[in-house]
C-alpha cells in the first residue's frame, strides 16, 4: 500500500471515528472524555426548562415601565422577563391581554401582579398548566365572581378621596396627593414622574370580577406593604391568609418594587425556584 493510500485511509478512519463520537454520548481528546454536542444540547435544554419566564403585570395608575428597577436584576440572574402593557379599559380586556402573553411562553411561567394587576393574574393564569407560581405584590386577589373592590369598604384606604374621574369614567390620582398616598418612600423626583405619567383606570374595573381564581390551584406568594395607603395592609393580609400564600411583609409604600427592588426580585426568584422543584 502506498504512503498516500495509507494517509487517505487514516484520515477516513479518523473522520468516521470523530463522527461516531459526536453522535454518541461523548467524544475523547487525548484520552479525556468530552461532552458531545447532543449532550450539551440536552443540558442546555434542561437549564432552559428549569428557569421559568417571569411575566410582570402592572396595576392601575401605572404601566409596564414601572418594573424598570426589578427587570435588570432578574435578567442579570438569568431570567427571561416580560412586562405586560395593559390598557386598563376593562378587567376582562386586561385579563385577555395578559392571558395571551402567558399563553405565548414556552415552558414554566411565574406570573407577578401588583395592585389591580393581582386581579388580572388571578383570572389570566387560571387553567394554564404552565403557570407554576403566582406572586402578589400589595395586590387584589379576588375569588371567582367576587368584585375586585368587594372589600374596599370593610378595609378602607386613604386613596379613595384622592381619585378624580374624567368624563369617560377613568380614574386619576390627584397629583398633589400622589406621592403621599401611592409612593411616599420613593424620591420626590421619581414620584413626580410617576404622577405625571400615571395611566388612568376605568372605574368599573373595580366592580368587575374574574370567572376563575388561579390561586385556588397554583402556589402563591404575597408581599404585604406595611405602610401602604392605597390598599389597606389589613386587606392585603386578608387576601394572603385566604389563599394560603407564603407571605412576606416589607416596610414600604404601595410600590415596593420601586422602593425595594432587590427584595422584590429576591422574592420572585424564590417563587421561581420553588416552582420548578
Residue ranges and their predicted role:
Residues 1-13, 17-24:
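Bacterial N-terminal signal peptides that target proteins for export
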Residues 22-42:
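Signal peptide processing junction and immediate N-terminal pro/mature segment
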Residues 49-91, 127-130:
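Conserved HGGG/HGGXW glycine-rich cap/lid loop of the alpha/beta-hydrolase fold
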Residues 112-117, 121:
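Gly/Ala-rich beta-loop-alpha elbow adjacent to hydrolase catalytic centers
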Residues 130-131, 135-175, 202-206, 239:
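Flexible "cap/lid" loop of the alpha/beta hydrolase fold
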Residues 134, 219-228:
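Conserved strand-to-loop "acid loop" that flanks and positions the catalytic carboxylate
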Residues 193-214, 226:
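Active-site nucleophile elbow and catalytic-triad environment of alpha/beta-hydrolase enzymes
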Residues 226-252, 258, 263, 271:
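Conserved loop-alpha-helix segment in the C-terminal half of the alpha/beta-hydrolase fold
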Amino acid at each position: 500500500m502506498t504512503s498516500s493510500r495509507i494517509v487517505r485511509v487514516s484520515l477516513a478512519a479518523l473522520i468516521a471515528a470523530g463522527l461516531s463520537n459526536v453522535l454518541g454520548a461523548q467524544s475523547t481528546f487525548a484520552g479525556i472524555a468530552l461532552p458531545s454536542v447532543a449532550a450539551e444540547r440536552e443540558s442546555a435544554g434542561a437549564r432552559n426548562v428549569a428557569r421559568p419566564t417571569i411575566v410582570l403585570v402592572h396595576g392601575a395608575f401605572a404601566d409596564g415601565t414601572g418594573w424598570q428597577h426589578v427587570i435588570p436584576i432578574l435578567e442579570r440572574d438569568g431570567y427571561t422577563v416580560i412586562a405586560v402593557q395593559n390598557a386598563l379599559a376593562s378587567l376582562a380586556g386586561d385579563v385577555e391581554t395578559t392571558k395571551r402573553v402567558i399563553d405565548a411562553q414556552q415552558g414554566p411561567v411565574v406570573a407577578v401582579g401588583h395592585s389591580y394587576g393581582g386581579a388580572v393574574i388571578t383570572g389570566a393564569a387560571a387553567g394554564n398548566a404552565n403557570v407554576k407560581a403566582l406572586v402578589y405584590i400589595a395586590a387584589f386577589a379576588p375569588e371567582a365572581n367576587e368584585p375586585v373592590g368587594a372589600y374596599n369598604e370593610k378595609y378602607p384606604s386613604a386613596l379613595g378621596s384622592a381619585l378624580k374621574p374624567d368624563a369617560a369614567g377613568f380614574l386619576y390620582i390627584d397629583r398633589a396627593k400622589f406621592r403621599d398616598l401611592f409612593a411616599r418612600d420613593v424620591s420626590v423626583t421619581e414620584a413626580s414622574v410617576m404622577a405625571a405619567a400615571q395611566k388612568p383606570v376605568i372605574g368599573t374595573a373595580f366592580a368587575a370580577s374574574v370567572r376563575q381564581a388561579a390561586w385556588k390551584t397554583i402556589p402563591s406568594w404575597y408581599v404585604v406593604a406595611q405602610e401602604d395607603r392605597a390598599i389597606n395592609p389589613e386587606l392585603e393580609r386578608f387576601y394572603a391568609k385566604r389563599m394560603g400564600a407564603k407571605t412576606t411583609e416589607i416596610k414600604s409604600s404601595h410600590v415596593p418594587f420601586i422602593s425595594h427592588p432587590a427584595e422584590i426580585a429576591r422574592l420572585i426568584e424564590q417563587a421561581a425556584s420553588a416552582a420548578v422543584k
